Each structure stands twice: as C-alpha cells, then as structure tokens.
Amino acid sequence: MSSLDKTMYFDFGANQPKDVHDTLVTVYQALEEKGYNPINQIVGYLLSGDPAYIPRIDDARNLIRKHERDEIIEELVRVYLNQNGSVKKS
C-alpha cells in the first residue's frame, strides 16, 4: 500500500486542551475587565479571525493567537459535549 492510500490522522496532542482552556480563561477575564461581553467577543474572533476582538490587556490577544481557531473550537465542542454527558470523555 502506498503512502497516498493511507488515511491521515488528525491529532492536536494530549496536552493541548489544557493550554487552550487556560488561554480562554485568561481571555474571558481580560474581556470582563475591559467591560466587554466575553462570549460575543470570543465568538467574533473565532468567526472572523480578527484579533481586534480581543484586548491586549494581560497579553490576551497574543495568547489566543498562539492557538489555531479550529483548535479552540475543537476544545469548546469537546468540553461542551463532555459536560452534558453526550459523549465519553477523551
């Protein structure tokens, strides 16, 4: 079987979710501190990729840009489904 026939495996690594979680907590707190609606601002960033949705306070903008947006969305979906008992914890 040639390498072109093999299925590629997509994995962010076992330690990535904790990093994404910590980043989201920091970003959320920075947005609250600035008086913004954290959920709306984070969603705006995730949809557009525009870092202007995230303030520079507490280095929040640089922290969130260290993660790909699809990694952040994957973590949000994983945590949501795990907390609601919809899937096995991974």
Swiss-Prot record:
Family, similarity comment: Belongs to the UPF0297 family.
- Write down the superkingdom of origin: Bacteria
Name listed for the protein in its UniProt record: UPF0297 protein LVIS_1222
